[in-house]
Every structure is written in C-alpha cells, then in structure tokens.
Amino acid sequence: MNSIAVVDYGMGNLRSVSKALEYVDSSAVVTVTSDPETIRSAARVVVPGQGAMPHCMQALDDQGLRESVIEAAKNKPFLGICLGLQMLFEESEEGNIRALGILPGRVKKLESTDTADSDIPKIKIPHMGWNQVHQTLEHPLWHGIDTDTRFYFVHSYYVATDEPQIVAGSTEYPVPFTCAVARDNIFAIQFHPEKSHSAGLALLSNFLKWTP
C-alpha cells in the first residue's frame, strides 16, 4: 500500500498538498498527521510548510516531530516543500537558528533591488509567482518535465550549499539560486508543486512512483 504522511506542524496549506497527492494517485492513502508514529509507519513522507523558519523549528519541537522527520529523511522517500526544503539544512539567517542539519548549507535571505536606478532590475521580496526551474541534475522526479518549466514560488529565503552534487534545480531572481536538491531518498524543492498546475502534479506523481 502506498501510504503517504503529510506532516502537519501547523504551517502551510496542507489540504491542497494532500488533495494534489490524492488526485495523482487515487489508490494512495494520504494522511495529514502530527503523530510521530503515523509518520514512522508511512511508506513516504511529505513535509510542506510556508512561513518563518524560527516558528517552523519551534513548532516541530513543540509537537515532538523533530526526530520522526529526521528519521523519515534518512530512511524513506521524502519530499520537502518550501520550508520543508529549508529545514533540512544546517542553519538559517532568519532568526539565526539551527535547522535539522541533514544537508550541508545555510538558508539565506533573497536580496531586494527595489531602487531608483533604472539599470538595475527591480526585484521585490518575497519572490512570488511563476518562474522557470532549470534542471541541473537528472532525477526520477523530473521525469516527463522539461527543463526550464515554470513552477510557482512564494518565499523570501533560499538555500545555499557548497556541495553542487546535491543541487537538482536552479532558478534566477535575477541571480541564480538553488530551488531543488536531491540526495539518496530525499528530494526537496523551494517552489510549490500543489500550486504549479500540470508540472507540479507530474512531479508529485513521480514522487509517488519513486523507489530510491
């Protein structure tokens, strides 16, 4: 049975993620849960999230979910979305806090260029809307999705890593930043597949078929 735990720590539109997963595989059993044992017993785990990293890490600890999320990221197909990507890294500039430390790197703030200089592209924060994702790593979750396909973003921070071998996708705003990472059983993305129409649904479908 393809059982998927969507981790509920109180941040993000979990219903839209779970409905998208059910749409791409009607036979899948999708459970939105804050129960560590349900997360441990699931075949696959999805960690969405939208908001501030300090609140995210505090919520994981308050609900006793830190260890079950770490275990899932080490042992089973794991999809991180937005904050679910950022929490995997070592630390965040947002609140200068430690994150889970599963992947090497740091969460950094996007730089605004909202100036009067006409030669500088006006870049406002948060980065919100559709943008191209350039695939930098061949991976099963990109199957059937063309490189430079547009996905939907809502974020003010991004992940920076010194290990290029884990970078699976990049986006420009206006400088390039990492928007997807992959290592072993982990695939994590800055954009929102549940808001990204057919491309997002294709990625979620690929995740449900993935056997790392």
Curated annotation (Swiss-Prot):
Ranges annotated as spanning the membrane: none
Name of the protein in its database record: Imidazole glycerol phosphate synthase subunit HisH
Keywords in alphabetical order: Amino-acid biosynthesis, Cytoplasm, Glutamine amidotransferase, Histidine biosynthesis, Hydrolase, Lyase
Domain of life of the source: Bacteria
GO molecular function, one term: lyase activity
Subunit structure: Heterodimer of HisH and HisF.
Protein's GO biological process: L-histidine biosynthetic process
Pfam families in the cross-refs: GATase
Annotated function: IGPS catalyzes the conversion of PRFAR and glutamine to IGP, AICAR and glutamate. The HisH subunit catalyzes the hydrolysis of glutamine to glutamate and ammonia as part of the synthesis of IGP and AICAR. The resulting ammonia molecule is channeled to the active site of HisF.
Organism of derivation: Nitrosomonas europaea (strain ATCC 19718 / CIP 103999 / KCTC 2705 / NBRC 14298)
Record gene name: hisH
Protein location: Cytoplasm
